[in-house]
From Swiss-Prot:
Role according to the record: E3 ubiquitin-protein ligase that mediates E2-dependent protein ubiquitination. Plays a role in salicylic acid-mediated negative feedback regulation of salicylic acid (SA) accumulation. May be involved in the overall regulation of SA, benzoic acid and phenylpropanoid biosynthesis. Involved in defense response. May act as negative regulator of resistance to the necrotrophic fungal pathogen Plectosphaerella cucumerina by modulating the accumulation of the phytoalexin camalexin and the salicylic acid- and jasmonate- dependent defense pathways.
A GO cellular component entry from the record: plasma membrane
InterPro entries membership: BAH1, SPX_dom, Znf_C3HC4_RING-type, Znf_RING, Znf_RING/FYVE/PHD, Znf_RING_CS
Disulphide linkage map: none
Main subcellular location: nucleus
Organism: Arabidopsis thaliana
Consequence the record notes for mutating S55F: In bah1-2; loss of activity
Known pathway: Protein modification; protein ubiquitination
Top-rank EC class of the record's enzyme: transferase
Keywords: Cell membrane, Membrane, Metal-binding, Nucleus, Transferase, Ubl conjugation pathway, Zinc, Zinc-finger
UniProt protein name: E3 ubiquitin-protein ligase NLA
Tissue: High expression in roots and stems, medium in seedlings, flowers, rosette and cauline leaves, and very low in siliques. Detected in cotyledons, hypocotyls, pedicel, receptacle, pistil, sepal, filament of stamen and at the two ends of developing siliques.
Impact after mutating E162K: In bah1-7; loss of activity
UniProt effect for mutating V156I: In bah1-5; loss of activity
């Protein structure tokens, strides 16, 4: 089955259960077909591609294809982030909050299996839309003999509406593993329903390649998502992980150091000019997200390392806190 038909059937099945946004795959392909008939082949510079300044013979770039795709991507990422955050907040909530949810009659979320299935559905939704976007941009480049699709993807990443960059995708993958592991530890039998016919996502795994941790999941469409869990600052497994708005993951204390802030003040006080150590993008610290599910997963999977790192970080945080309050005291007394 061709991906377009597979995607349309998947989205149709989802919309019967809940009204959720998607990529207008068929509509965008029709735009490209018209472009194929009218397009005069010509090479377009990479700079022009970023600015979307195509030749006039190409009706696709004349305020049609990219604006339409951009709006759909914003809707997809916005819906995914909102629902993923709600699900994760429910899982990490106190017993009282969970009790209120149960009393309100949200039967799907109140049981263990319901949480697993909803998390799996959200990851599947994110991945199948990511594949749809990748394929339609690849088709665009093929028809135009250009790199505009790749340039658009780069621009979207800078705008932070690339779904694979979402910290909530990483959190959902860790959440999925955590729930399955806790089910095993409790000794309960895991009875999962067969995967949907058109599902791409078949589960996640935390793997170690030469001691380096990777959070990964396989797609049936020959695409693999790997999230490197090695902090590029301390070159060790991320501890108390945090995701910057550019999508890169660091230890919380390493991120504070890179942003030139004290752990007492936190990343919210970072200057807008401070840049990500990897991509050098600025303004990425204030919207950083704590990866609590990933923190739980790594704590469970790397017990010895976690305990050793916890002791080291505790001593360092206490030292930083002491220096911070000593400085505040001296400033107040004028000494």
């Amino acid at each position: 089955m061709k991906f377009c038909k597979k995607y349309e059937e998947y989205m149709q099945g989802q919309k019967e259960k809940k009204n959720l946004p998607g990529v207008g795959f068929k509509k965008l392909k029709k735009i490209l077909k018209r472009c194929r008939r009218n397009h005069v082949p010509s090479r377009i510079s990479f700079t022009d591609a970023i600015n979307h300044n195509c030749s006039r013979e190409c009706p696709v770039c004349d305020g049609t294809f990219f604006p339409e795709l951009l709006k759909e991507m914003e809707d997809v990422v916005g819906w995914f982030n909102e629902h993923a955050q709600k699900l994760l907040e429910l899982h990490l909530a106190s017993g009282f909050t969970k009790c209120l949810t149960w009393l309100r009659g949200n039967s799907r979320k109140k049981d263990h299996h319901g949480l697993i299935q909803e998390g799996k559905d959200l990851v599947n939704y994110a991945l199948i839309n990511a594949v749809a976007i990748r394929k339609i941009l690849k088709k665009y480049d093929k028809i135009h003999e250009s790199r505009q699709g790749q340039a658009f993807k780069t621009q979207v990443q800078k705008m932070r509406i690339e779904i694979l960059q979402s910290p909530w995708l990483c959190e959902l993958m860790a959440f999925h593993i955590n729930l399955k592991e806790s089910k095993k530890e409790s000794g309960a039998t895991i009875t999962s329903p067969p995967p949907p016919v058109h599902a791409l996502f078949d589960g996640c795994a935390l793997t170690f390649d030469d001691g380096k941790p990777l959070l990964s999941c396989e797609l049936s469409d020959s695409v693999k998502v790997d999230i490197d869990l090695t902090c590029s600052i301390c070159l060790d497994t991320v501890f108390d992980p945090i995701s910057l708005t550019c999508g890169h993951i660091y230890c919380y204390m390493c991120a504070c150091s890179a942003a030139s802030v004290n752990v007492v003040d936190g990343l919210k006080t970072a200057e807008a000019t401070e840049k990500c150590p990897l991509c050098r993008e600025d303004g990425v610290y204030k919207g950083a997200v704590h990866l609590d599910e990933l923190n739980i997963l790594l704590k469970r999977s790397c017990r010895d390392y976690w305990e050793e790192r916890r002791k080291t970080e505790r001593a360092e945080r206490l030292q930083q806190a002491k220096e911070y309050w000593d400085y505040q005291c001296r400033s107040f007394t004028g000494i």
